[in-house]
Design a protein with these regions (language model features):
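Acidic, contiguous internal or C-terminal segments within carbohydrate-active enzymes
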Residues: 1-34
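Solvent-exposed loop and beta-edge segments used for protein-protein assembly and interaction
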Residues: 7-11, 39, 131-135
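Hydrophobic residues positioned within well-ordered beta-strands of beta-sheet architectures
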Residues: 13-15, 45, 137-139
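A generic short-segment signal for beta-strand/edge and adjacent turn/coil regions
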Residues: 15-16, 48, 60-63, 103-112
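Solvent-exposed residues in well-ordered beta-strands and their adjoining turns
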Residues: 18-22, 50, 140
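Active-site/ligand-binding surface loops and adjacent short beta/alpha elements
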Residues: 26-100
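Beta-strand-rich recognition/accessory modules
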Residues: 90-141
Length: 141
């Protein structure tokens, strides 16, 4: 847990992933989009929201918003959704680290038919991790 603020009503979670290629050939990362399926560039960090978040609001840097954020680069993405039966909402904020490969990432994001967001360094272009190299990915949500 990165930070907890009960008075402010928020908390954050820091996520770090490390993968070392121990093979004697490159390890290739791709997505369905790199195989020819349009707007299917999910991979890397992936979040699927609760059913009640369907139809939520999508926001990103530079004034980007809505489903048009799909495939766009941004150092952050916010998803605002409502909770069943309460009338209350929450905002989930995803931050891509400047130390990550291909920062800022391209986002795979939907609000219909369900809420999801993916910070994808291989959205529409394969990434090769060479033998002996380590891939380090850091995020905050």
């Amino acid at each position: 847990v990165g930070e907890v603020d009960p008075a402010g009503g928020f908390w954050s979670l820091d996520l770090s992933f490390r993968l070392k290629n121990v093979r004697n050939r490159p390890l290739i990362f791709g997505s369905p989009a790199t195989e020819g399926r349009p707007a299917a560039g999910y991979g890397g960090l992936f979040w699927r929201g609760p059913r009640s978040f369907g139809g939520g609001e999508i926001l990103a840097a530079e004034g980007l918003e809505g489903p048009e954020v799909m495939g766009q680069t941004s150092p952050w993405l916010a998803y605002v959704g409502l909770h069943d039966g309460t009338g209350r909402g929450s905002t989930v904020l995803f931050l891509d680290s400047p130390t990550n490969v291909r920062f800022p990432c391209k986002w795979f994001v939907r609000n219909d038919p369900y809420a999801c967001a993916s910070c994808s360094f291989m959205f529409d272009e394969e990434y090769a991790l060479e033998p002996g190299e380590e891939l380090a990915l850091d995020y905050r949500a």
